[in-house]
C-alpha cells in the first residue's frame, strides 16, 4: 500500500504516525512504537529500561546500621506466657472440674465423643483468650495443639497419636448448654468466688470488715427475630460484683431482669431484680458481711430496709431526685452542724493549697426539719483540684456506717466512687474481647449459660492479669491485656498445653504485695 494511503505511515501496522508522536500529544512512545508497557504487577517485577538509577544497588546510598543508645525493651514471650498460664490454671481446674463434671444436662457422656467438661472448657478457654464470638472460637479450633490443650484442661483421656484429634464446634457447645440448668451452673461461679474469699484475696479490700459488692444492671445480649418487639429483643441482667481498690470487679451473682410481658403489659425493673438477688445472696452467704454499693436508683428506703434486715451495710449515691424531702433536710442540717474538713494538696512551689471540702451529717439530725430522723449518714465530697484521691469530683453518698471524723468520711467517699469498677468491667467485657452484648444464640437457657461461662472466664482473667501477667509485664509494660491474650492464643495454637507438663511448670507464685487498699 502506498504511503499516502497509509496516512503517511511508513509501517502499515504502526499505531500512530511519527508526525503525532511528539510534544506530549498522541499515545505514549512505548505504546506507539509497539513497545511493552509496565503496568500493575509487571511494573513491580520487571526493570523499566527507561528509568536509570544514579547509584545502583539496594542500599540507595544509606549508611550501614550500627546500634547506639539504650537497649530496646524486652518483647513479650508467648512461650513464657503459656508456661505461666499452665502454673496458674492448675489449682482452678481442681476447683471447677469436680463441680462441672456432674452438670451434664440430658446427654449421656458415655455415648458422646466429647465429655461435658470438654465442652465447658472449650467455651471458657475461648472467652479467656478474648475470642468474642462463636465464629472466632471455631476459627482455629481443629489444630492439634489447641485440641490437646482443651482436653488437658478438661482431663478427658485422649490418644496422642490420634490423627483426627479435634475440638467440638460451637454448635455442639450451644446444643449442650441449652440443656444445662442455669441455676446449677451459677453455683459453680459462686464456689469459685468462695475459693477466692477463703484464699484471702479480698483481705486488703474489706471496708470495716465488710466485702464491698457493687450492683448495677447491663444489657446482656440482643435476641434476633423480626417477630419480637424492641423490648422483647433485649436481655437485661442485674449484676452483683465484688469491687476492690486495685480495680477488680469479680462477678458474684446475676439476676435476670425479666423481659416485657405482653399479656400483663408489665416490664420488670432493677429494683425488683435486686429484691430477688438479695434474697439469693443471703441464702448463699448467710454469715458473710457485705457492703452494698449502688447508684442513686437504689438510694431509697426499701433497699436500705433490705440491707438492714440482712445485716448488711450500704453506700449509695445520694441525689436530690431520689429522696427530695430528705435531701433538702440534709442540706439544712449541714449548715447547722458544720461538720466538715478542708482537703489540701501540694502546689508546684512545694506549699500547701486547698483542693476540696468533705462534710458529713447524721440524717438523724434532720429530725429538726422533718419531725423524724433517718437511720443513715450522708457524706458530701467536693474537690476542684488534684488530691490524693484523684482529680476534680463532686458527689454525695448515703451510708449506714458511722461517720464522726474526716478520715472515715474520705474512706466512705472513696468506696462510693469505686462503684465505677463495675461500669469499667462492663466496658471491658463489651469492647475488650469477651463479647458482652453479643448474641451467641437465641435460646434463653443457652444464652444465660454462655453469660455465666463468660463471667467465670472473666474472673479467672482478672486474677491471671493481676497475679501473673503483672510479673511478666515488668520489662514490657506497653503490652495490653488484649495483646497478652493474643500471645497466649498463639502459644496454644503452636505449642499447646501438653508441651508444658504441670510437673515442670509448677505452681505459679501470685503477686499480691500490690493488692493493698
Residue spans for each PLM region:
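Polybasic, low-complexity terminal segments and linkers that are predominantly intrinsically disordered
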Residues: 1-31
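A short, flexible helix-boundary coil/loop motif
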Residues: 3-4, 9, 29, 80-83, ...
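Gly/serine-rich nucleotide phosphate-binding loop at the start of the catalytic core
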Residues: 4, 26-161, 497-509
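Conserved, well-structured functional cores that handle cations and Mg-NTP chemistry
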Residues: 94-98, 107-316, 480
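Intrinsically disordered or highly flexible coil/loop and linker segments, enriched in small
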Residues: 131-132, 421-426, 462-469
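Charge-dense polyanion-binding interfaces
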Residues: 193-201, 205, 325-326, 331, ...
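An anionic, glycine-rich sequence signature occurring as long contiguous blocks
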Residues: 313-421
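A C-terminal functional module that forms or caps the active site or interfaces directly
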Residues: 397-403, 409-454
